[in-house]
């Protein structure tokens, strides 16, 4: 469109959109945006106007003291490219087998220290409540919500949750792939051993509600989820999953991911309790398939209970010891799909519009639904 007019580069335009907002960018160079075929003006405006949040994004950092804080990562640049306003910045402690008491706690503290320094390098602050999220969005400043995937670091010590809270933790994934030293509940990919939520897991949920930490029940089996919902006094999130009817085109991936998907019945239970469920990018080979997976979940539990939770990485993988990680298609947020030409949230908004979502609906799924439960959870302590 209007290709004879002077234009900015795509990077210059996307930066302007993120920093100044769509309206300001157009005022600075009103024709430049539409000279870039990849960015539709309606998409750009929605991205600028909404608080786009990925509720489960892995940022790999070192967990051993000799490697803290790791190589510089361009988190700010990746976030601006993506169009996201915020991410729930998470990491896991059990990728390398935990073998002794205290090891998970040490990894957790090293991970937080690494993240402290990486955030400082990037000029990014943690959002501790909804007011922080809204202020960062108003200032066009990327922000993060500190998360952890799995309560392995607790090791039976309730007081460690308070320590984590004071270090900025506001989103706790109760479980991950392996059982913690002091278990919190049954993991959906492991044989059930504990009858659902354990007594210590119940204590942790109560303490999260008291302190003001959002509880994430991803990786929990049905019995654990049911017990947690009966106990919780604030809404919860299942940050990354997909409806078990949406299996995609890759049969191998479908078989592997099937235990990690949520049934219609369980999704309704979470929604009826006021919770939200994040749809991941797995099992979606194209942005349109991803938007269709979002639509499938919306059709089951309603527009007010669905959010985005990619289970991807904005920044490169970190391999302990300096090893090489080749990565794979779909691993990085801004490269979620083959031949993706624009940042993640721009791509998703475009696909959602093409799938029939309204601007208001995109705003809810993009971030408003998460903001509602995050606000309710962090109201435990201001």
Residue ranges and their predicted role:
Residues 204-208, 250, 255-256:
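N-terminal secretory/targeting leader peptides
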Residues 194-229:
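Loop-centered beta-sheet repeat module
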Residues 8-191, 244, 252-382:
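N-terminal hydrophobic targeting/anchoring segments and the immediately downstream early-domain regions
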Residues 1, 52-54, 236:
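A composition/secondary-structure signal for short, hydrophobic, low-basic-content segments
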Residues 235-241:
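Short hydrophobic/aromatic-enriched beta-strand-loop microsegments
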Residues 1-9:
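N-terminal secretory signal peptides
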């Amino acid at each position: 469109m209007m290709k004879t007019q002077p234009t900015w580069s795509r990077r210059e335009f996307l930066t302007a959109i993120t920093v100044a907002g769509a309206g300001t960018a157009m005022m600075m160079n009103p024709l430049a945006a539409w000279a870039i075929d990849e960015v539709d003006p309606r998409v750009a405006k929605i991205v600028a106007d909404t608080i786009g949040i990925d509720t489960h994004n892995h940022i790999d950092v070192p967990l051993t003291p000799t490697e803290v804080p790791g190589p510089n990562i361009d988190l700010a640049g990746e976030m601006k490219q993506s169009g996201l306003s915020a991410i729930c910045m998470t990491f896991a402690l059990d990728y390398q087998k935990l073998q002794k008491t205290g090891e998970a706690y040490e990894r957790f503290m090293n991970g937080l220290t690494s993240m402290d320094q990486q955030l400082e390098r990037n000029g990014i602050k943690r959002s501790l409540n909804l007011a922080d999220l809204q202020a960062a969005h108003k200032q066009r400043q990327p922000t993060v919500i500190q998360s952890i995937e799995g309560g392995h670091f607790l090791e039976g010590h309730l007081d460690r949750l308070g320590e984590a809270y004071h270090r900025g933790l506001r989103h706790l994934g109760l479980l991950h792939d392996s059982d913690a030293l002091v278990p919190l509940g049954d993991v959906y990919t492991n044989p059930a051993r504990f009858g659902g939520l354990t007594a210590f897991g119940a204590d942790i949920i109560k303490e999260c509600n008291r302190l003001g930490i959002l509880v994430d029940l991803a990786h929990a089996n049905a019995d654990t989820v049911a017990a947690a919902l009966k106990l919780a006094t604030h809404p919860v999130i299942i940050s990354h999953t997909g409806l078990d009817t949406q299996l995609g085109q890759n049969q191998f991936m479908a078989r592997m991911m099937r235990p990690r998907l949520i049934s219609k019945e369980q999704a309704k239970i979470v929604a009826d309790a006021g919770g939200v469920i994040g749809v991941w990018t797995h099992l979606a080979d194209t942005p349109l398939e991803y938007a269709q997976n979002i639509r499938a979940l919306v059709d089951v539990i309603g527009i007010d209970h669905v959010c985005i939770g990619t289970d991807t990485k904005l920044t490169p993988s970190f391999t302990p010891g300096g090893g090489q990680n080749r990565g794979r298609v779909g691993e990085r947020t801004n490269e979620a799909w083959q031949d993706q030409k624009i940042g993640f949230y721009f791509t998703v908004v475009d696909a959602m519009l093409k799938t029939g979502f309204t601007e208001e609906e995109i705003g809810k799924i993009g971030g408003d639904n998460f903001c509602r439960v995050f606000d309710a959870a962090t109201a435990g302590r201001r």
